[in-house]
Amino acid sequence: SNILVFNKDNDSKICDLGRSACLDISSNFLTMRYTGDMTYSPPEVWYRFFEPDWKKRTYAIDCYMLGSLITFYFAGVSMSALILSKMPNQYHYLVWTGTFNQVEEYLHAVFSEVIQEFERNIIGEFYKDELIELVKQLCNPNPEKRGHPKNSTLSNDKYSLERFISKID
């Protein structure tokens, strides 16, 4: 439901990454920590990490959502579902009472396992390595480390999706 196919040539576009919000338009969603379906939310939401900068928080989540959509397309399950399926119970967000920083190393360990599982679901060697790297950059469990490495020096565009979309296109 997130990919629209337009014609007999199968031209397609990503159509939805969650509930939309814009700083220039008044909305009840602007004050929410996360506006989407919790089933697909990124790890920082589960563990109550809150980035006060709206743009930074929202764009980091957008990165994760795009990576999760790509994961779903190839693995048949979202990144969030994969991470939670491998998370040891004592570190599951419903049980965990510590901070996001305290659970981060466990998230990264599980993320490594999930990436290996994702890799096994990609058929075809032509784009496999690039696709894996793309998902790693988009879905890093630490929102501060998400995004394309070439964007890391661009303070306003750290989470820009343009480089990723160019790769996918």
What annotation goes with each model-predicted range?
Residues 139-153:
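A conserved short helix/loop substructure at the end of the activation segment
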Residues 43-47, 75, 140-143:
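Residues at helix-coil transition
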Residues 1-43:
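Activation segment/activation loop of eukaryotic-type protein kinase catalytic domains
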Residues 152-169:
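Regulatory extensions appended to serine/threonine kinase catalytic cores
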Residues 22, 37, 69-73, 134:
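Conserved hydrophobic scaffold of the eukaryotic protein kinase-like catalytic domain
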Residues 48-124:
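Conserved C-lobe activation region of Hanks-type protein kinase-like domains
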